[in-house]
Amino acid sequence: MSNLKEQKIFDNDYKSAKFIGIKGHWSNDVLITHDNKLIQIIKLSGFSFETADDEDLDIKKDLRNSMFKGVGDSNAKIYTHIIRRKKVPYSPGYVNPDMPYGFPSYLDKKWIARSSQKESFINEIYISLIYKNSFIKNPVTEIQNQFLKKKSDNTAFLQAMHETHESLLEVSSRVMSSLRDYSPEILSIEKVDELYYSRPAEFISDIVNGIDERKIIYTTDDLSKHIVNSRLIFKKKYIEIKQHDGSSKFASIVSIKEYGPKTWAGILDNFLKMPFEFVISQSYDSINRQIAMSKMQLQQNRMIQSEDKAISQVVEISEALDRAMSGEIGFGQHHLSVMCIEENLKSLENAVSMALVEVSSTGGMSVREKVNMEPTFWGQIPGNFHYLGRKSTINTSNLASFNSFHNYPLGKAHGNFWGDAVTVLDTTSGTPYYFNFHLRDIGHTTIIGPTGAGKTVLMNFLSAQAQKFRCRLFFFDKDRGAEIFLRAINGKYTIVDPGKQCGFNPLLLPDTGENRIFLLEWLKQLVSVLGEPISAEDVALLTSAINGNYKLDPKNRKLSNIAPFLGLEGPGTLAGRLAMWHSNGSHARIFDNDEDVIDFSQANVFGFEMAELLKDKFSLSPVLLYLFHRISISLDGSPTMIVLDEAWALIDNPVFAPKIKDWLKVLRKLNTFIVFATQSVEDASKSAISDTLIQQTATQIFLPNLKATSVYRTAFLLTEREHHLIKTIDPGSRFFLVKQGIDAVVARVDLSGMNDVINVLSGRADTVLILESVIKEYGDDPEVWIPIFNQKLKESQNKTTE
């Protein structure tokens, strides 16, 4: 405090730069202060705690305790910060130029407008490591240092600084390793468009200028002068931060005055969803363990002698002493402050009230800074320990509780495998979640949800948002739930019904080695649907039939014309087993056709209704073999997604199960991923392919299920907390659980009030009938039929309610 008085801190016209204390960059990723401290700043994405079990959180707390103790033993000092800033997912007026015209663009604009109306925040976590130049710790040495610095040869000073730098990097390396689960990143100078910017300086600028999000160009000049971008006016209870454009922000600071008797992992987690911007600053300066233990013993003796009734505190001190004597914990001087930031004074008062309550909920006593406000403000800057007035001794286990480094995942907005994020989802914390199917280059995804949970709407919404990538889409539908949507995005929709003409003819495939291999597998499947074995002689006959097929004129290539190659029909013969598939056979209308209706060059989107096919155990595998083969040979490396509704019913069979693992790898190499969806977790749990899908899928989505059994945990390796969330989330809220890598988040697609969009994304038997009548009368141009469809649906609903 005396330092500030000497510099006339209450003169509102003073130059703020002198209090920052940052001289410049010692190296690309290390700052140096005016008193020769070195600082390295590490940014953390944080640990996804919302769905983690308490046991896991406690384990991570113990690991952080060990890390903090190690840092303290190395004589490094620590600052940590949480910066909660407003984040608009989309800039004002943003229109995605890559979204196809029509329904995808219409939906995208409405979703962007909805997302832009909501006040969103993100949490940024930082840990700063501060190392003092050992060469100037000793007063005598400091005099020598000043003398050396005045001489042209300052070798001793530089050597001392080099050693300090090496010590800092050694500590930093250990911290980076300890915090690997928190996705650490060292802030450094970065090059953008031929200019160099200082990210460490930008971090400090956020603290000083009330979270201003500006770029700071790297300079060899005094960096403090370039950090200040606002005029700071310190009032009695608040700070006015005047911006260059004439606008102002207002800030007040809440601190811990007295600490509570206990701490726990995630003690500050509620701050992570507060509806205002803030900067939480903490500092930790280790002290001698023996001195700390002596103070604790003295405090304990006083409590005992005064017959203090707080027996639990006496016991806790004994436990802490035991842990200290065993070297399990260290001690240090700690401060914690919360700078609340708002755009007007009324909102600021509300924010301060919430912060006071939340700090008090830790079990301690909170205070709003007034006289001590300005020193605390400058004390937020890493290295400015001398400005801090409210410091108390805590142990490293307490420090690990106050610094859980928990966070809500943000996903990844840019630089994903396909580019920008697929879409932005709402979350329970008010932070946006940038959703991607891909984690690195793996995009395979599972979506699990019971009937009525919103699975169809979610699948179709995500598929619609993915159209920005101009990707090809192959959608295997059930009960025509996606038909309206697929037709709305100009898709070709085919109802695959074994009892009707399907228009498939695999024998018209071009004569290639790959197609010949497929035809042999396909024919083998046709002649063994009743479980008959395939002999070597059978394989030879089938191969002969394939050879014969390609000797025929293309117009004659069909099943009924190659059947004679298999010999005479009779019970149990190869020709007899093929008879059901051609001519007058029970399933002849599927494959024995003069032409093949499949032409994947006609469009980018194709839908196949599979409900009737799923009822026919004979036809399912041969038809899927053909469709998947046609899709596979059409893949050329352009972005492609395949959606399998009721995936387990489609592919969990002896034909596909053995090859699913290799198939997924091949698709990945061809820039293609699959979305596996199902409503029956029990069926999935009994499946031979579930283990493979869990290992090969990057993203898992679980919709609420009030009847979720323990099968969820065993089949999909969920934590107890994740299982609990799935069971307790209100299905009407449209929230769901997204798991990707080590991250998990509760998110939702809120389409309330967008009935015209929901009508398209969610097909039902009655709405599909309306669609059929509208298309029959007005044609299949979505621009024409969608408005008419919505109007007729509205009229139908009005009649129902009358």
Language model features: what each stretch is:
Residues 1-410:
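Extended, folded cores of ATP/NTP-driven motor/assembly subunits in large transport
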Residues 439, 451:
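The conserved Walker
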Residues 47, 54-72, 269-270, 364-365, ...:
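P-loop NTPase motor domains
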Residues 471-483, 497-498:
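Short beta-strand-centered segment that lines the nucleotide-binding/catalytic pocket of NTP-utilizing
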Residues 447:
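Hydrophobic anchor at the beta1->P-loop junction of P-loop NTPases
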Residues 491-493, 689-702:
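A short helix-turn-beta junction within AAA+ P-loop NTPase domains corresponding to the substrate/partner-engaging
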Residues 458:
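Hydrophobic positions on the alpha1 helix immediately C-terminal to the Walker A/P-loop
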Residues 455:
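Conserved lysine of the Walker
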